Amino acid sequence: MKFQLRQLHLECPDFGFLRHSCASGVIRTRVGFSGGTKPNPTYRSLGDHTETTEVVYDPTKTNYSNLLTMFWKNHDATQKCTRQYMSAVFYHNEEQKRLAMESLEKAQKSITKPIQTQILEASTFYEAEDYHQKYLLQQHPWLMNALDIEPGPELNQSYVATRLNGYIGGYGTLANFEAELPNLHLSDKIADYVRRAMQNGNRVNC
């Protein structure tokens, strides 16, 4: 199942959804552009698209409503932005549309300022350039080399890279990492490296 949204204006679009990268049930994340009419947009030639994060999740382990709750909790939906950076949820079917609208109404009741988030039908999702994908993970060359993974399709589709991108960015707990570790099939050296990175709490800025 897919969950697609725009969360925050960040120079590196990969940062906005790191909390979801290591959230329960999330299989894969990609950053890119959507919602506009310009064919084949790029970061430097975006046209009328919005920077977007696509999240693929396992519906047996989490659900759309849980992801929406995280979305509202972790950004300021009242901030007015240009279309490139606007807050938006892109729905893929009528059920997602209904849930997104209901969650927006619920979120609005808890604050006085008007929410600016747009609920839009999903259109073509264009992947952002490789250097945007799993951005924080790519700032750890030793780890990338140890994982034997290169920027490109393999990195973009990797479950392990998705999870580690969140953990290495400081958006997961050490307890959750330890619980998940058997399913990640990491070497002891890689696991120790991730632990140290999480404990250091150093987040990379663009």
Predicted segment positions?
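Flexible coil/turn and secondary-structure edge motifs
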Residues: 1-206
